[in-house]
Amino acid sequence: MKVLLIKDVKALGKAGEIKEVKDGYGQNFLIAKGFAKAATNEVLRKYESDKKKEAENLRFEIANLEKLKEELSKITLEISKPVGANGSLFGGVTKDEIAHALKEQSHIEIDKKSLECDTLKSLGIHEVSVKLGHAIHAKFNISIKAE
């Protein structure tokens, strides 16, 4: 009997593979436990269709992330912070403040956990990197000025 594996099965194969197994093993274990489906023409067509839709969605998502990366590369955020008598910042600029400023100034919402920087503790222009997903990283500038 031929089965289409839905989940990875140790010593048999990975999800998406078509395997030839004995009838009892296929019916009583793999199909009964939800590890596989009988590899009928209908099941295989549906699997291929779902696979194509998933690939198309992935391409669409990557295209959107590339567009966002392009938008972010053109941005320079302006953040004003109080400074001491010697010109140093009080506390610095945190990831939370950067994410909030990005949302306020550019209307782009980024999770602060995806920002790849430490607390910025000096005035001037700093480059910040952000993980967008699917191995796509974007960089943008932050200008920290005295209040």
UniProtKB/Swiss-Prot annotation:
For biological process, the GO terms are: translation
One molecular function GO term is: structural constituent of ribosome
Record bears the keyword Ribosomal protein = yes
Q: Which Pfam families does this entry report, sorted A to Z? A: Ribosomal_L9_C, Ribosomal_L9_N
Q: Which domain of life does the UniProt lineage start with?
A: Bacteria
Q: Which GO terms describe its cellular component?
A: ribonucleoprotein complex; ribosome
Entry keyword annotation includes DNA repair: no
SUPFAM superfamilies according to UniProt = L9 N-domain-like, Ribosomal protein L9 C-domain
Keywords annotated in UniProt: Ribonucleoprotein, Ribosomal protein, RNA-binding, rRNA-binding
Similarity annotation: Belongs to the bacterial ribosomal protein bL9 family.
| Function statement | Binds to the 23S rRNA.
Entry-linked NCBIfam families: L9
UniProt xrefs under PANTHER family? 50S RIBOSOMAL PROTEIN L9 (PTHR21368)
What is the recorded name of this protein? Large ribosomal subunit protein bL9
Source organism per entry reads Campylobacter jejuni subsp. doylei (strain ATCC BAA-1458 / RM4099 / 269.97)
